[in-house]
Amino acid sequence: MGYGYVPSSPTDPRASGLEPARPVGPAPGSLDVADVFPSAAPLGTAGTSTALDEKLRRAYYWMVNEAIISPHYDIEFEMGDGAPDTTVNLGETGAALHLPTAPSYSSFMLMPLLTFAVRGRCLLIGGPGRGKTTSAILMGVLAGYPVEQVRRGMQHGHPQLSVTDMFGTPLPRDLVGAESLADIDVAWRSWLGMRVKIIDEYNRIPTRTQSALLTVLADGYVEVYDQLYETGDAAWYLTANDDAGGGTYQVVEALRDRIDITVAALPFNPRFLPGLIQRREGDFRPERHVPAEVVFSAAEHDAISAQIQSVRVPQAVLRRLAFFASQLEVCEHAATQLEYRSKDTARLTGGDVAGLLRRSTGRDRLTDLADQTLSGMSVRAMNAVITYAKAMAFFRGHSDVALEDLRAVLPFVLRDKIQPNLDSPVFASDEGRLLVHDPVSWLRGLMDTACLAYDAAGLDTDDPVGEVLAELHQGLTGVTHAEVRHRLARIESLARSLGYGGKLYGHVADDAMALKYAHQRYSAYMSWLEWDSGSSAGAGP
């Protein structure tokens, strides 16, 4: 088989919804002419096309088995049917070798592919020669572009890269003869219209050009000489040799925040050196052997993005994400007013977040999630987590997001967005010191701890604040004055009960503010009811 071969068998029969083939013969005497000489099958019958989720899986398996040697299955899933767990501890630190019971995946291959599907923004980090650029180029070829066009469209960061070099140059004749900026035409760079955009070594781009790039990433347009070019939806791939923001130029914080997901290239396993030599001797370049079966047209690209957005997120999964996010943001000593007691308040005023966290007493700093981080989750980060969790569920052939999908993608989305508090005693132990350099395992552990706390609190079955909000969101039309008073009394009772715990955990603070929100809505509605009833009573015949 050649490098461009894609097996026709389903990558995951259960996800594909196919039944195993069974040998079935005709009953004696039942053959007729149509059985011996079957007519051509009509167009549009089953088997003439591949479902987009199956096509996405085939693209992944071709990449991981044929294109890039990356035998690192660091995104693990389990069958969940009581299959025996196989884990071996290696070395003096007890490094765990776990053998998953369900299909598991290489993050360096899968996360860029999911970025392609959702048209997100992916940062590939790692040392030189690790395959970052090759992986990004493969994404461009998967979009149907010739290799030469992908390479021409790839932007290379360097200290002299200007805004016009990167985006477009005004025509010289217009610069000479134009009477206003509106008369100047700009020769836009062709890469701006591509569905896959690649910025190699983005941390070597000058700060001024980074600011222009930020506008393109954030708003989807670029401006040169008062002329606008809308770039449209695209999958972005940026590469860097480290994720500390360093390089020739420090990366602008706002630009780093626009990146949806960060993936590290893992080291090459010398066990696979024979395959590497074979590729070198055969001059094999994976980007030139991409099978047509895994290339996505523009229409398919639009369709797969729309299908991913239609994947449902069950309330139980969403509540766990909300609980996790709540734990990270609260900072009890950041302000006096409840709404301002967040790490963001302290950061904006130049405060020492780690010092403020040390002042919190009465907490177990080893289990308190807020103590381990210097920042919380932004709205953009929450949206990215949900989008990639949907993409993971879609890739695995599911119509609903499972908690394991969320757990798989969350560390890669938050890797560059949640900063650890190294003053926390969690990082003082031998195991904690390993987590300092392993942000993916640290963030996954945070999520696991949050889920345990969520289950211990029984919030799936006992969520009175959620009931209040659900009742409010049904609308106020027809709700009587007496019913409003009853609901306000319940809200006030719930608010008082929140103070019985004595400790201001993140979900408690968020529940308190949610109750205040509902109280304001009902109070305003009751004022309107009183005004309306008074107006009606004072009206003459």
Where are these regions (language model features)?
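Conserved beta-strand position immediately N-terminal to the Walker
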Residues: 122, 197, 235
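Basic, amphipathic alpha-helical bundle interface domains used for macromolecular binding and assembly
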Residues: 101-108, 286-424
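Interdomain "pre-motor" coupling segment immediately N-terminal to P-loop NTPase/helicase cores
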Residues: 3-75
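Canonical AAA+ ATPase core
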Residues: 173-176, 201-209, 217-310, 390-392
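Short glycine-rich substrate-engagement loop in P-loop NTPases that contacts/grips substrate
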Residues: 158-192
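Walker A/P-loop
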Residues: 113-158
